[in-house]
UniProtKB/Swiss-Prot annotation:
It is found in: Cytoplasm. One of its GO terms (cellular component) is cytoplasm. It catalyses: a beta-D-galactoside + acetyl-CoA = a 6-acetyl-beta-D-galactoside + CoA. Pfam families: Hexapep, Mac. Keywords: Acyltransferase, Cytoplasm, Lactose biosynthesis, Repeat, Transferase. Its EC number is 2.3.1.18. It comes from Lactococcus lactis subsp. lactis (strain IL1403) (Streptococcus lactis). It is an enzyme of class 2 (transferase). The gene is lacA. This is Galactoside O-acetyltransferase. InterPro entries: Hexapep, Hexapep_transf_CS, LacA-like, Mac_dom, Trimer_LpxA-like_sf. The keyword Ligase does not apply.
Length: 207
């Protein structure tokens, strides 16, 4: 019987057992860096960024993650663009790749999940899982408490309302919310002129 090499199946959407020793060693090393990041003072932004560059697969400039921050593999499979802001308790179940575009905003308590399990109880009791990559495109805003499930893609510029459960792809340039998350409307011209139920945007005169 051939030996199952679980570490080769992590990024392929195939079933595997995560107790593979090679995977466990990689995870331990990543979690040590994550622990250091969460213990770093807010007065040490340079040290925080230095740690994030070691932790993440990719991370651009001007990114900020408010501790505490959680990730299964400490960010090892996370690809961040530039100018990303994440409020506290961002949770990335990064068993496979999570791609986040430039200028994405995460509210507090957002969860991005790539790992899932088969329905079969026999397989689940043995710990079997498989992973599906998640894509958050540029300029997306995820409100507080949003949960994004494995395999989802959220299109650029879209807004996901607080508390939403995103189970399917969301297109570009829409406002969507709910459980399950559904598109409510498109982003339109008035959104560039007003905010909060019709208040005029007046920031241009200060820029």
């Amino acid at each position: 019987m051939p030996k199952l090499e679980s570490y080769k199946r992590v990024h392929t959407e195939e079933l595997y057992f995560p107790n593979d020793q090679k995977l466990w060693k990689e995870q331990q090393e990543a979690l040590v860096l994550l622990e250091k990041f969460n213990q770093t003072s807010v007065t040490q932004p340079e040290q925080q960024m230095e740690l994030l560059k070691k932790m993440f697969s990719e991370i651009g400039e001007n990114c900020f993650i408010q501790p505490p921050f959680y990730a299964n593999f400490g960010g090892k499979n996370v690809h961040f663009g530039t100018g990303i802001y994440a409020n506290f308790n961002l949770t990335l179940v990064d068993d496979t790749d999570i791609f986040v575009g430039n200028h994405v905003m995460f509210g507090p308590n957002v969860t991005i999940d790539t790992a899932t399990h088969p329905v079969s109880p026999d397989l689940r009791k043995r710990g079997a899982q498989y992973n599906k990559k998640v894509y958050i495109e540029e300029n997306v805003w995820l409100g507080a408490g949003v949960i994004v499930l494995p395999g989802v893609r959220i299109g650029k510029n879209s807004v996901i309302g607080a508390g939403s459960l995103v189970t399917k792809d969301i297109p570009d340039n829409v406002v969507a919310f709910g459980t399950p998350c559904m598109v409510k409307r498109k982003i339109n011209d008035s959104d560039f002129k007003t905010y909060d139920h019709g208040k005029k945007i007046d920031l241009d005169e200060f820029i």
